[in-house]
From Swiss-Prot:
The keyword Phosphoprotein applies. Pathway: Sulfur metabolism; glutathione biosynthesis; glutathione from L-cysteine and L-glutamate: step 1/2. The modification Phosphoserine is found at S59. The lineage of its organism: Eukaryota, Metazoa, Chordata, Craniata, Vertebrata. One of its GO terms (biological process) is response to oxidative stress. Heterodimer of a catalytic heavy chain and a regulatory light chain. Belongs to the aldo/keto reductase family. Glutamate--cysteine ligase light chain subfamily. GO terms for cellular component: glutamate-cysteine ligase complex. The modification N6-acetyllysine is found at K263. This is Glutamate--cysteine ligase regulatory subunit. It comes from Mus musculus. The gene is Gclm. GO terms for molecular function: glutamate-cysteine ligase activity; glutamate-cysteine ligase catalytic subunit binding; protein-containing complex binding. It holds the Pfam family Aldo_ket_red.
Length: 274
């Protein structure tokens, strides 16, 4: 892997942006870890294997070009939705903002997901709570810039429905009253509450908000874990220079049968100072 790693390291030393996409994990076959114990473990494994695959297939032309934006893809697993089957599929995504960057990440994540899957719009996007400093309670002000961008995407028909994650009754009520496009769902982590809070259930029922459950950790991808995965896959690199900005996890479900046809991750990272 030495030569591959050196070529990948040289490209990453010059580029400013990294786009990583796993393709459809159901197409990975034996590459995929059979039973990842957590979502974080699955994600880290996916990042490393995608980096390994990409670095092993770098062409001499790419090294000569030194592109500013690197497209790191598990090429054999890429799978676009057949336009003839689009109406039969539900395309859902959950967006995790990782870096302390602007809300424009929301648009770039949705645009990239549509491009990767070959669709004009996503049926549903749930926004994980944005990162905040330790000891600070999540407020409406934290959510507003991201929600406004999601609203713009609904109005421009890039998304059909938008939802939230891990909001309590007060937070959900504040967002609902302020928002132009109302949340149609709110995910609740059952690790933190075995039973749905009655006040949240009552509010959601009153305003027709679907309550869903999830088991994502509070921090699915940290800056440190991304840099460790990068360093392990490509030793010839200053991994600490790279910061993940956002992560999007998508799933494509056959509506009539409830079967997952495709699922994967898309990620964007930036090099500091670039």
């Amino acid at each position: 892997m030495g030569t591959d790693s050196r070529a990948a390291g040289a490209l990453l030393a010059r580029a400013s942006t990294l786009h990583l996409q796993t393709g459809n994990l159901l197409n990975w076959g034996r590459l995929r870890k059979k039973c990842p114990s957590t979502h974080s473990e699955e994600l880290r494994d996916c990042i490393q294997k995608t980096l390994n695959e990409w670095s092993s297939q770098i062409s001499p032309d790419l090294v000569r070009e030194f592109p500013d934006v690197l497209e790191c893809t598990m090429s054999h697993a890429v799978e676009k939705i057949n336009p003839d089957e689009r109406e039969e599929m539900k395309v859902s995504a959950k967006l995790f903002i990782v870096g302390s960057n602007s809300s424009s990440s929301t648009r770039s994540a949705v645009d990239m997901a549509c491009s990767v899957l070959g669709v004009a719009q996503l049926d549903s996007v749930i926004m994980a709570s944005p990162p905040i400093e330790d000891g600070v309670n999540l407020s409406l002000e934290h959510l507003q810039p991201y929600w406004e961008e999601l609203e713009n995407l609904v109005q421009s028909k890039k998304i059909v429905a938008i939802g939230t994650s891990d909001l309590d009754k007060t937070q959900l009520e504040q967002l609902y009253q302020w928002a132009q496009v109302k949340p149609n769902s709110n995910q609740v982590n059952l690790a933190s509450c075995c039973v749905m809070p009655p006040d949240l259930t009552a509010f959601a029922k009153q305003f027709d908000i679907q309550l869903l459950t999830h088991n994502d950790p509070k921090e699915l991808l940290s800056e440190a874990s991304f840099q460790e995965a990068l360093q392990e896959s490509i030793p010839d690199i200053e991994a600490q220079d790279w910061v993940p900005l956002w992560l999007l996890r998508y799933s494509v479900i056959v509506k009539s049968r409830g079967i997952i046809k495709s699922k994967g991750y898309i990620l964007q990272a930036k090099r500091r100072g670039s």
